[in-house]
C-alpha cells in the first residue's frame, strides 16, 4: 500500500472517530488544501489534513516508513533540551562515526546506551541520556568519543590506504584527511 493510500485510510478513520458528516469533512479538506477530495491531495496536504484531525481529537497516528538502514541518527540540534550545549557536538561526532561506518547502530538510542555504560560507572547520580550530562561530564564524554573515533580512523587509513598519519594529528584535521580518502561527507 502506498504512502498516499495509507494516509487517506487514516484520514477516513479519523473522520469516523470525529463523527464528521460528509459536508463538514469536505469543507475541512477544501479549507486546508483547496481541493474537494482527499484522493486529489498530495502527501503533504494529506499530512496537513491528518494533523488537523488529530488537533480535533482523532486518535490516529502516522508512522513513517522504516528503511533497511537506520536513518534516525539523532534529533536535530534545536529539537532537544540539553543541560550542556556540548551534547550537540557529541551527537554530531556520533553521527559522523555512523556515516564513516564505525558503528553498527548510529541511532540516538545506541548513543545513550553507550554513554550510560561509559559515564555511569561508580556514580550515585546516573545520567540517562546525553542531554542530561552536565558540562564537565559532557566534555569528558566528548573527549572519549573523539579518541575512539580518532583511533578507528587511524586504523582504517593505515589498513585500507597505507596512509600513516601521526597520532599527534588533531581530531578535526584527521577528520578532513579521512574525508579526503573516503569521500565521505
Swiss-Prot record:
Domain of life per record: Bacteria
Native organism taxonomy: Bacteria, Pseudomonadati, Pseudomonadota, Gammaproteobacteria, Pasteurellales
Similarity-based family: To phage Mu protein gp16.
Name the UniProt record assigns to this protein: Mu-like prophage FluMu protein gp16
Originating species: Haemophilus influenzae (strain ATCC 51907 / DSM 11121 / KW20 / Rd)
A matching Pfam family: GemA
InterPro entries: Phage_Mu_Gp16 (IPR009363)
Amino acid at each position: 500500500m502506498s504512502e498516499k493510500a495509507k494516509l487517506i485510510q487514516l484520514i477516513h478513520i479519523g473522520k469516523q472517530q470525529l463523527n464528521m458528516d460528509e459536508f463538514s469533512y469536505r469543507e475541512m479538506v477544501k479549507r486546508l488544501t483547496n481541493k474537494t477530495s482527499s484522493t486529489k491531495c498530495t502527501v503533504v496536504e494529506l499530512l496537513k489534513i491528518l494533523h488537523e484531525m488529530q488537533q480535533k481529537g482523532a486518535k490516529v497516528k502516522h508512522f513513517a516508513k522504516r528503511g533497511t538502514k537506520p536513518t534516525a541518527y539523532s534529533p536535530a540540534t534545536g529539537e532537544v533540551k540539553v543541560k550542556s550545549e556540548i551534547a550537540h557536538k557529541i551527537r554530531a561526532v556520533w553521527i559522523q562515526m555512523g556515516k564513516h561506518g564505525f558503528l553498527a547502530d548510529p541511532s540516538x538510542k545506541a548513543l545513550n546506551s553507550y554513554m550510560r555504560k561509559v559515564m555511569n560507572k561508580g556514580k550515585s547520580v546516573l545520567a540517562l541520556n546525553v542531554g542530561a550530562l552536565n558540562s564537565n561530564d559532557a566534555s569528558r564524554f566528548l573527549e572519549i568519543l573523539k579518541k575512539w573515533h580518532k583511533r578507528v580512523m587511524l586504523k582504517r587509513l593505515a589498513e585500507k590506504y597505507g596512509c600513516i598519519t601521526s597520532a599527534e594529528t588533531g581530531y578535526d584535521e584527521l577528520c578532513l584527511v579521512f574525508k579526503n580518502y573516503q569521500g565521505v561527507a
